[in-house]
C-alpha cells in the first residue's frame, strides 16, 4: 500500500491493514481514516507501518463517565504503542481526547510529528519526554484546554515547532451560567533550562490571554514567535531580538494595539 484513504465513512473500528502488522517489511506513505466513527482498534490488532497516519475526527479511545455522570471522557487508545507501530507523523485532530495515558507513546520509536489539536487536553503526562518522544520535532497542541503552560513539551530534545493557539475552556458561575474563556494566561519562567529551548524555532501562542512576558523570560532563540490576538499582553522585547527583527532574521506575529515594549521599529500604536 502506497496511499490508502477511507475517510468520511462509518467505520467503528480500525482494522488490520497488513498481514504482518507493524512487523511488515512494507511502509505505506499515507493512511487516512479521518472522519469516521472509530472508537477502538480491531481485536488482535497487529499494528501498522505508515509514514503518516491520520485518525482525525474519530471519537477515539475508551469512553467513561466522570464522577458527576454528566460528561463522557476519552483516553487516547494504547494499541498503537502496544503493537510498536512504526509511524513518523501521527494526526489526531478533533478526536475528543481528554487524557493521554502514560503508555500512549511508549513504543512509537520513530515518531517525528504529532498533531493533537482540537481535543480536550489539559495536561501532558510526565512520560511525554525524551525517552518516549526522542525524535519529535513538530507538536501541535492548538485548540485544547491548557490553563497551565505545558512545559512537559519542552523536555523533547529535538522540538522545532510548537503550536499552542487558542486554549479555551467552559466555566460555570454560581448561577449555573456557562461561558467559554481563554484559559491560558500565565507565561512560564525558566524556559531556558529545558532541552527544547535550544532547538525550538517556531512558537505560536496566538489567540490566548497571556498577560505578561518579561524581558528576561522572552524566547530569544526562536526565529518565529506569534503572540497576536492576546488582547491583554504586556511584553518587553530584548534589544538583540529587535535587531534580528529589523534585519529579517526574526518573525514576530503581533497586533498593532498590543502593549509591546523595547522595539520601536514595530508598527505599534504605542510607537506612533
Q: Which positions does each model-derived feature cover?
A:
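Acidic/polar low-complexity surface segments
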Residues: 17, 21, 57-78, 165-187
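Leucine-rich solenoid repeat scaffolds
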Residues: 223-272
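Inter-repeat linker/turn residues at the boundaries of leucine-rich repeats
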Residues: 9, 23-26, 36, 48, ...
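Conserved hydrophobic beta-strand positions in leucine-rich repeat
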Residues: 2-6, 29-33, 51-55, 88-92, ...
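Consensus "Asn ladder" position of solenoid repeat domains
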Residues: 6-9, 36, 58, 95, ...
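Conserved hydrophobic position(s) of the canonical leucine-rich repeat
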Residues: 1, 11, 28, 38, ...
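Canonical leucine-rich repeat
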Residues: 14, 41, 63-64, 75-76, ...
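Hydrophobic anchor residues at the C-terminal helix/turn of individual leucine-rich repeat
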Residues: 17-23, 44-46, 67-69, 80-82, ...
Amino acid at each position: 500500500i502506497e496511499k490508502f484513504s477511507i475517510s468520511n465513512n462509518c467505520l467503528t473500528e480500525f482494522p488490520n491493514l497488513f498481514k504482518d502488522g507493524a512487523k511488515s517489511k512494507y511502509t505505506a506513505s499515507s493512511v487516512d481514516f479521518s472522519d469516521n466513527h472509530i472508537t477502538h482498534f480491531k481485536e488482535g490488532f497487529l499494528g501498522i507501518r505508515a509514514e503518516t497516519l491520520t485518525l482525525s475526527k474519530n471519537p477515539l479511545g475508551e469512553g467513561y463517565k466522570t464522577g458527576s455522570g454528566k460528561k463522557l471522557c476519552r483516553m487516547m487508545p494504547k494499541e498503537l504503542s502496544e503493537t510498536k507501530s512504526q509511524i513518523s507523523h501521527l494526526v489526531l485532530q478533533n478526536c475528543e481526547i481528554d487524557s493521554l495515558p502514560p503508555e500512549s507513546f511508549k513504543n512509537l520509536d520513530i515518531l517525528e510529528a504529532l498533531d493533537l489539536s482540537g481535543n480536550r487536553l489539559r495536561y501532558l503526562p510526565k512520560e511525554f519526554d525524551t525517552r518516549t518522544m526522542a525524535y519529535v520535532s513538530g507538536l501541535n497542541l492548538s485548540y485544547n484546554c491548557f490553563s497551565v503552560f505545558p512545559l512537559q513539551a519542552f523536555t523533547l530534545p529535538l522540538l522545532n515547532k510548537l503550536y499552542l493557539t487558542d486554549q479555551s475552556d467552559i466555566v460555570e458561575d454560581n448561577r449555573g451560567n456557562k461561558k467559554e474563556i481563554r484559559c491560558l494566561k500565565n507565561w512560564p519562567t525558566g524556559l531556558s533550562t529545558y532541552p527544547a529551548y535550544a532547538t525550538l524555532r517556531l512558537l505560536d501562542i496566538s489567540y490566548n490571554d497571556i498577560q505578561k512576558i518579561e524581558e528576561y523570560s522572552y524566547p530569544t532563540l526562536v526565529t518565529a514567535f506569534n503572540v497576536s490576538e492576546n488582547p491583554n499582553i504586556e511584553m518587553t522585547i530584548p534589544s538583540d531580538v529587535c535587531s534580528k527583527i529589523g534585519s529579517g532574521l526574526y518573525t514576530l506575529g503581533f497586533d498593532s494595539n498590543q502593549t509591546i515594549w523595547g522595539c520601536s521599529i514595530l508598527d505599534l500604536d504605542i510607537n506612533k
